[in-house]
């Protein structure tokens, strides 16, 4: 399967327009086209990238973006830099859904509300135009 097909599906599931302005969602790293395997995780930490390498997965779909605010340097001195370097060196794409999924009407918050048996729920601060 092609990366573009998977990102198209993910963007239908959690449209990037739903994300908060401060967030960094979507395709964060990519130098690949044919996807050999997908690893899904909460945070794309260095250990997750190691697992993706071991399992021959070249796409990591994570909830939180590993690149949240701009990197000023990439020296490998912290876990973010090491994870990004390792992903790029091993041709692993990283895709984050974070607030795009948070803000979806059937997303993370609805799942939690349903699991807790809550009724009459509503979005406290709805995103404009949705």
Give residue spans per PLM region:
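Hydrophobic structural segments
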Residues: 1-130
């Amino acid at each position: 399967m092609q990366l573009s097909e998977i990102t198209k599906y993910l963007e239908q599931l959690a449209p990037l327009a739903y994300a908060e302005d401060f967030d960094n969602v979507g395709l964060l790293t990519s130098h690949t086209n044919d996807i050999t395997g997908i690893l899904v995780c909460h945070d794309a930490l260095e250990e997750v990238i190691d697992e993706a390498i071991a399992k021959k997965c070249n796409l990591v779909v994570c909830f939180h973006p590993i690149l949240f605010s701009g990197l000023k340097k990439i020296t490998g001195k912290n876990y973010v830099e090491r994870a990004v370097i390792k992903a790029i060196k091993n041709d692993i794409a990283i895709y984050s859904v974070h607030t795009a999924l948070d803000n979806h009407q059937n997303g993370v918050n609805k799942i939690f509300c349903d699991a807790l048996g809550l009724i009459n729920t509503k979005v406290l601060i709805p995103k404009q135009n949705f």
